[in-house]
Amino acid sequence: MEDILLVIDIGNTNIVLGIFKDDELIFEWRISTDLHKTSDEYALTLRQALEYSNVKKSDVKEAIIGSVVPNLMPTIPKAVKKYLGIEPLIVDEKIKTGIVNKYASPKEVGVDRIINAVSACKKYSTPVIIVDIGTAITFDYITENKEYLGGAIAPGIAISSEALFMKTAKLPKIEIEMPDSVIGDSTVKSMQSGVVFGFIGLIDYIIEKILEEKDKTKDEVTIIATGGFSYLIAKQSKYITIIDKLITLDGLKIINDLNKND
């Protein structure tokens, strides 16, 4: 019999499930976030994922959930309890994290940002800037003393691209991919250029302003990217040196370990 930890990261676009055996992430699944699914449907999805990976449900001893989608709480915790028979730990502003939340109103911070901050402080040297390039783009700064100061939030790449399509009469829906040239020779290529290179510029400028405000050089700060579009955008950045797509799942594991005996 194994001691397995289930971690669930509920995002606006996707839900990511991970299975940890000891300190190793052995399986990861990504499903679409669906507000209309019932707890029974999510329980069936969980069952399929575990069976596909040959993980016995009796081996899953712990579960932890971090969510930025309030409407799926308590749907997914209920699914975990129904299928696995365990009460999942929920990440909120009261949970032990090992960092100091210096946000003006700590409960306002998205738990994904705190989870990422916890993970970054454990895995990398501080101070650190985390850029999460997902549905929204978040920037977070954590000091040498593991103080979470906050950061910036910008609209995401997909949201912005969708807005061009929805709010104009003639602009088409486009695939988000790296264009061959900044100067697009078609409407689609021009839009791809504006969206992709525009966001590279946005990300680098905000990082630059954070460094300036904290009186740091880029060599004095660990600068990490994560999120669905991190591989597309971060490789073109002048400042980002690490791409860590598992930072949130690792953070959930770290927080679970911190709260195990509470």
From Swiss-Prot:
Assigned EC number: 2.7.1.33
Q: Which residues form the active site?
A: D112 (proton acceptor)
- Kindly provide the name given to this protein in its UniProt entry: Type III pantothenate kinase
What's a single GO MF annotation on this record? pantothenate kinase activity
Domain of life of the native organism: Bacteria
Looking at the UniProt entry, the stretches that span the membrane are none
Q: Does the keyword Metal-binding apply?
A: yes
Q: What is its main location?
A: cytoplasm
- What high-level taxonomic lineage is stated for the organism? Bacteria, Bacillati, Bacillota, Tissierellia, Tissierellales
* Location of this chain's protein in the cell: Cytoplasm
Q: Which organism is it from?
A: Finegoldia magna (strain ATCC 29328 / DSM 20472 / WAL 2508) (Peptostreptococcus magnus)
Q: How is the cofactor bound?
A: A monovalent cation. Ammonium or potassium.
